[in-house]
């Protein structure tokens, strides 16, 4: 079976490693950047881990590599599993190596194809970059247990290049899910729905968090449903951008139903009742990735692209402003925008091409 290298040592990385080990008998190489090795070092100290899943599980021992070159050497698939704000640093390190025999996979993607185009040496670029809308699982690690809380029925991916049947088949077998192939990575960028629910939910929880109320209600049980009107408004604005650009996507609720199933008839009911989200804690601090990543690195760019194509996004703008106030930082200037991506002055077609890694 083709070698898999996993960059990052967080929840998704370890669940993917455990899934491959227990379902396919495959040991994956795991590497993490020196600047962010808390989880990596913790796993090393534990030795072996236990995958706990709804249908299968068991012990596995990740192959931890201190050296990036060793980790990716001979890998057919290199998985980038770090948050959006950590991807660029790793891509800069990958630029030192020949990736022309590998496929780079962003799990999930967030304009990763564009970042690769701007960062990696063309002659040594990967066969293709594949971006995913989401991770294959709802998951988290608790000490030595890697909890695969729920396996998504399907999730969406897109590639910068047409893949051979051999490469595509080798990729699809790595997952317990059925994959839905979108036409291009630009659609994936606008279908990463983290900025739809996360920022609205944590902003709804602001007073509770800042007052230090304990026990604090669960994030998806209490605060996302409390903000559901705002969540829905952001989602509608997102889809208006998608339609204006001629891309493909679905509503946040449609994705939730497609990924997880269940009997919920609307978004509020889903968030209030889905067991896979039931125990997810509310952040204890407002300086959290729900704002510092989902707003700063994704939503800001959505807003700027909307302005280019003449789409009104008042709810998105209000979230950017509130997040800026909370973080004491003008995210419309410090966030990832068109100018920081060398796309200032670009028209809609040029922006879509860039997001597709062209």
Swiss-Prot record:
Keywords: Crown gall tumor, NAD, NADP, Oxidoreductase, Plasmid
Entry-linked Gene3D superfamilies: N-(1-d-carboxylethyl)-l-norvaline Dehydrogenase, domain 2 (1.10.1040.10), NAD(P)-binding Rossmann-like Domain (3.40.50.720)
EC id: 1.5.1.16, 1.5.1.11
NADP found in the keyword field: yes
Catalytic activity: D-octopine + NAD(+) + H2O = L-arginine + pyruvate + NADH + H(+); D-lysopine + NADP(+) + H2O = L-lysine + pyruvate + NADPH + H(+)
Alphabetical list of Pfam families matching this protein: Octopine_DH
Domain of life of the organism encoding this protein: Bacteria
Top EC class, one word: oxidoreductase
Function: Reductive condensation of pyruvate and arginine, lysine, histidine, or octopine to form octopine, lysopine, histopine, or octopinic acid, respectively. NADPH is the preferred cofactor, but NADH can also be used.
Subunit (UniProt): Monomer.
PANTHER family, per the entry: BLR6086 PROTEIN, OPINE DEHYDROGENASE DOMAIN-CONTAINING PROTEIN
Entry similarity comment: Belongs to the lysopine/nopaline/octopine/opine/vitopine dehydrogenases family.
Protein name: Protein ocs
Gene name of the record: ocs
């Amino acid at each position: 079976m083709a070698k898999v290298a996993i960059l990052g040592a967080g929840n998704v990385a370890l669940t993917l490693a455990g899934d491959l080990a227990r379902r396919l008998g495959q040991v994956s190489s795991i590497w993490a950047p020196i600047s962010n090795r808390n989880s990596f070092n913790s796993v090393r100290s534990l030795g072996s881990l236990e995958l706990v899943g709804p249908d299968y599980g068991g012990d596995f021992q990740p192959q931890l590599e201190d050296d990036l070159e060793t980790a990716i050497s001979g890998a057919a698939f290199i998985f980038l599993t770090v948050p959006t704000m950590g991807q660029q640093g790793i891509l800069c390190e990958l630029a030192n190596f020949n990736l022309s025999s590998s496929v780079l996979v962003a799990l999930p993607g967030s304009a990763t194809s564009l970042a690769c185009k701007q960062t990696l040496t063309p002659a040594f670029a990967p066969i293709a970059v594949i971006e995913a809308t989401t991770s294959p699982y709802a998951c988290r690690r608790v000490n030595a247990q890697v909890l695969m809380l729920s396996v998504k029925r399907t999730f969406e991916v897109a590639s910068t290049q047409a893949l051979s049947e051999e490469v595509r088949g080798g990729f699809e077998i790595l997952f317990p899910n059925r994959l839905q192939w979108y036409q291009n990575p630009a659609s994936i960028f606008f279908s990463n729905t983290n900025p739809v629910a996360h920022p609205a939910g944590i902003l709804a929880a602001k007073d509770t968090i800042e007052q230090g109320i304990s026990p604090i209600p669960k994030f998806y049980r209490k605060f996302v449903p409390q903000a559901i009107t705002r969540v829905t408004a952001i989602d509608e604005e997102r889809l208006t951008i998608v339609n204006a650009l001629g891309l493909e996507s679905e509503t946040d609720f449609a994705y939730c139903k497609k990924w997880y199933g269940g009997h919920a008839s609307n978004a509020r009911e889903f968030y209030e009742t889905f067991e896979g989200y039931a125990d997810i804690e509310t952040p204890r601090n407002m300086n959290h990735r729900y704002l510092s990543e989902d707003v700063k690195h994704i939503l800001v760019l959505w807003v700027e692209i909307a302005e280019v194509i003449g789409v009104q996004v008042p709810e998105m703008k209000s979230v950017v402003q509130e997040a800026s106030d909370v973080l004491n930082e003008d995210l419309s200037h410090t966030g990832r925008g068109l100018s920081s991506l060398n796309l200032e002055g670009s028209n809609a077609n040029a922006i879509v091409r860039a997001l597709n890694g062209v």
